[in-house]
Amino acid sequence: MNEEYDVIVLGTGLTECILSGIMSVNGKKVLHMDRNPYYGGESASITPLEDLYKRFKIPGAPPASMGRGRDWNVDLIPKFLMANGQLVKMLLFTEVTRYLDFKVTEGSFVYKGGKIYKVPSTEAEALASSLMGLFEKRRFRKFLVYVANFDENDPRTFEGIDPKKTSMREVYKKFDLGQDVIDFTGHALALYRTDDYLDQPCCETINRIKLYSESLARYGKSPYLYPLYGLGELPQGFARLSAIYGGTYMLNKPIEEIIMQNGKVIGVKSEGEIARCKQLICDPSYVKDRVEKVGQVIRVICILSHPIKNTNDANSCQIIIPQNQVNRKSDIYVCMISSAHNVAAQGKYIAIASTTVETKEPEKEIRPALELLEPIEQKFVSISDLLVPKDLGTESQIFISRTYDATTHFETTCDDIKDIYKRMMGSEFDFEEMKRKKNDIYGEE
């Protein structure tokens, strides 16, 4: 371990593993350590089930009705992948896809007036949907056609809207869309957690709706993918990539000290040995004095013996509860998967509800989601701090990832990865460029 590295990475969460893989592909010498004996950090999948009970300090062993403990892989953080999103692109460009199998999630649902409705995934479904009335549907369709044709680099597609200036509120007004449709569009399609976006320039929202539509177009049932055996497979896939390109991995390594000189990181001390480095990437748990808390997320993992009511017995789905349906500022999400994904015993379902904490009683806040899941066989409640780095790391060369937010997809995580990459390398992260570098350094496949 007493060696020189270009980059040392602490923690094997998804952000850290992807960056470690990318740095190795870029020809950098990487050492990757984690104090835990397992991969994934905050974004791990826990197996066997007994370990989940221990982690949440639930007394006794899981009952026999839960099946074999090792049939379970329970994600601590619930997220899906957008089929056409940034994470899938990263998986494809790095060829990490060869280590993973994905299934399309069976449906996306939205909560309205105490009931859940399927988010239409075809024009026929949209016409038949009871989410909106007939005239509303026509206006909504016109809006979707506009979005599909929109190209921020081609002013001919703007139709009088300035993507950098016109607010989304004005765009909705132009198409004469009602409040219900606005809620649905902003929260179930553009996947915003709050309504702050309404007064921002519309370009970002239109592109988010395009991402949803393009992801949906890929597989037809829903825009979401989920890996067999759980999300813990993702960091492991990128860790393999890093190892193939010469990265060194060490799990179960207690980190004693991050060594600084003149305000800059020069190495990491573990078990009495020092590994030297020029740059350090880590999650907030390794540098508690360099991060600040900006909020909290509550997540409740629920084990069920039945599919969720009114979802056509889907073996996987997402439910979005828009904030103003339950008088909140931020949406509540439910991600549900099952034995079909090799993450639960036969006939069992895992539903994870999550939201941004807004009051002193987070468990009360998440109740509307739990009511949709009853009866619940066992629940595991966690409240996590949302931590962000206090500075950009340019002085110290310590680059800290953000904790995982309450969104149900990885787009914000990928934004963080690209942001850290840019700060470390001084250039934008470019998929094509990465592919070329890989071929230059390691030859064509």
From Swiss-Prot:
The modification N6-acetyllysine is found at K112, K269. Ubiquitously expressed. The modification N6-succinyllysine is found at K57. InterPro entries: FAD/NAD-bd_sf, GDP_dissociation_inhibitor, RabGDI. It holds the Pfam family GDI. GO terms for cellular component: cytosol; Golgi apparatus; membrane. It is a peripheral membrane protein. The keyword Acetylation applies. It comes from the Eukaryota. The modification N-acetylmethionine is found at M1. The keyword Acetylation applies. One of its GO terms (biological process) is small GTPase-mediated signal transduction. Its main location: cytoplasm. GO terms for molecular function: GTPase activator activity; Rab GDP-dissociation inhibitor activity. GDP-dissociation inhibitor preventing the GDP to GTP exchange of most Rab proteins. By keeping these small GTPases in their inactive GDP-bound form regulates intracellular membrane trafficking. Negatively regulates protein transport to the cilium and ciliogenesis through the inhibition of RAB8A. Interacts with RHOH. Interacts with the GDP-bound inactive forms of RAB3A, RAB3B, RAB3C, RAB5A, RAB5B, RAB5C, RAB8A, RAB8B, RAB10, RAB12, RAB35, and RAB43; binds RAB3D to a lesser extent. Interacts with DZIP1; this interaction negatively regulates the interaction of GDI2 with GDP-bound RAB8A. Belongs to the Rab GDI family. This is Rab GDP dissociation inhibitor beta. It comes from Bos taurus.
